[in-house]
Amino acid sequence: MKTKHLRLMQRAYVILFFCFMYLPIAYMIVFSFNQSKGYALFTGFTLKWYTSLLHNSAILSALRVSLEVALISAVIATVLGTAASLGIASMSRKSRLVITNITYIPVVNPEIITGISLMLLFVAYQRFSEGVSWLPDTIMGMPTLLIAHIAFNVPYVIFNVTPKLKQLDIKLYEAALDLGCDPRQAFFKVILPEISPAILSAFLICLTYSIDDFMISYFNCGTVETLPIAIYSMTRKKVSPEIYALSTIMFVVILTIILISNAMESREYHRDQKALRGEDVK
């Protein structure tokens, strides 16, 4: 009897937890289709708020900036993070532990501290460049935004790719060298195919975090406006149903990216399990 009550309490807790997490999002999605501007009573279904987004030049401009920054920073961060992971994997155990702990600091560091510290660095550069003729007078704007996004994305790539490298059988790489491959060929034919799911998953994570970031972007964007900053500016005046529609689209896009990333990781896990059991892996 006690076990039955305990299970009921556990289920009730899980249900309450998910309601607490997702009811506000569900409420927002429902009222993004509301006919009226009010958010207390649903008066009818409409798509006009989604249509009006397509004619909002400020939102479209901010969306373009966010996508450009997310794609460019995700690609660069993925390349740098993968290269760093290869270097970390080749270190001794003690050195690898030290570098891993150092890399972990930006992940646990509050975003506001990261944003302000990067801003101070860019301001210091700007003051230094005033006395150097061949340096740009200012880089605040798209350059600083890209650097900031790359900086906070690289650790996530390292933590995603390094575990996969640890699982890699180094004998496969050595066998490729023995069979006549040079180090570059062995990397592209043996190592890269094995870690490519982790690399792609890391890229999707970087893309998600970059699109979603507000705090670090806010301090380092200059006059450039990303989508989260544009939404923040809109909410300071009034909460329009357009914001509900825009937030719903962002939620669906980010959720899709996360689901794709999780599906890839799950597929890779089952593939590894089949390989361990000696089954045919396709």
Predicted regions and their residues:
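C-terminal transmembrane helix and the adjacent membrane-cytosol boundary/short C-terminal tail
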Residues: 2-12, 162-177, 187-189, 244-282
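Transmembrane alpha-helices
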Residues: 13, 18-25, 151, 157-164, ...
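Membrane-embedded alpha-helices of multi-pass transport/permease systems
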Residues: 23-26, 30, 79-83, 116, ...
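Transmembrane-helix boundary motif in ABC transporter permease subunits
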Residues: 1-7, 72-103, 116, 120-123, ...
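Non-cytoplasmic
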Residues: 26-37, 157, 198-232
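Short membrane-interfacial helix/loop motifs at transmembrane-helix boundaries
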Residues: 23-57, 121, 220-222, 275
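Membrane-interfacial helix termini and adjacent extracytoplasmic/periplasmic loops
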Residues: 38-40, 47, 112-150, 184, ...
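Interhelical loop and adjacent transmembrane-helix boundary motif
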Residues: 2-7, 50-58, 211-268
